[in-house]
Regions:
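Secretory/organelle targeting and membrane-embedding segments
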Residues: 2-229
Length: 229
């Protein structure tokens, strides 16, 4: 949560006129937050047998990201004001549906109880009971021992009405905020395809944080230590 790009979420929302007016149930179809890891939990079996993936990353890291996306505009962009806005939002969050899983081989780790049902994977859907978000699914997906390490927020906008195009309806706009492995964000838009006619295709406008700042980007723990000092 101390990563530079995470601090960018509120700034992207509230300092860009093109986003905040669209940040609601009338324009957004769904929000999906994914936090996948390649490593297994063989070195953390004692912790995982007690708490599982829900208490490992869902109740803290993922809910914090959900709150940053869903909160109302804070009085200011100070940490205290943002904290209040996030807390108010989380009071409105309710579980809707979902399922849990466990990666193959977990039961073979030393220290795992025989027949353990501890979850190492979660695919959960929540709803937010307020005027802005009523009816919009917020999906949290996370797991251990997966193919790719990735933390990303995908905000999918509702499709536009059918126009006189060959591809109808056209692809939906999507804002993607990538935290790991490559920090940055991208906005997928529709544009005219080369040639005659009115066929459209998805194009991407991308901001790559590491491409610009590279080694100058402070590490997450570095940010925390500076705040403490």
């Amino acid at each position: 949560l101390a990563k530079e790009i995470v601090g960018n979420i509120a700034l992207v929302r509230f300092t860009n006129r093109i986003f905040e007016p669209l940040w609601n149930k009338e324009n957004i179809e769904s929000v999906t937050i994914t936090l996948n890891e390649k490593l297994d939990v063989s070195m953390r079996v004692g912790f995982f047998e007690k708490f599982g993936v829900l208490k490992d990353v869902v109740q803290n890291h993922m809910f914090q990201l959900l709150a940053l996306v869903g909160m109302e505009e804070p009085e200011s962009l100070t940490s205290d004001a943002i904290g209040i806005a996030k807390a108010e939002l989380l009071e409105k969050v309710a579980f809707k549906t979902g399922y849990l899983g466990q990666y193959e081989g977990y039961l073979q780790h030393q220290g795992v109880e025989q027949g353990s049902k501890v979850a190492t994977y979660a695919n959960l859907e929540f709803e937010i009971d307020n005027e802005r978000w009523h009816g919009v699914p917020f999906r949290l997906i996370t797991g251990k021992c997966l193919k790719e390490k990735e933390t990303v927020i995908k905000i999918k906008f509702k499709p536009v009405k059918c126009l006189l195009t060959k591809s109808c309806p056209s692809d939906q706009n999507e804002l993607r905020i990538s935290i790991v492995p490559r920090a940055g964000f991208a906005l997928e838009l529709n544009a005219k395809k080369l040639g005659n006619g009115n066929e459209v295709m998805p194009v991407e406008m991308e901001y790559c944080h590491e491409c610009i700042y590279g080694l100058y980007t402070p590490l997450a723990y570095e940010t925390i230590l500076k705040a403490v000092i």
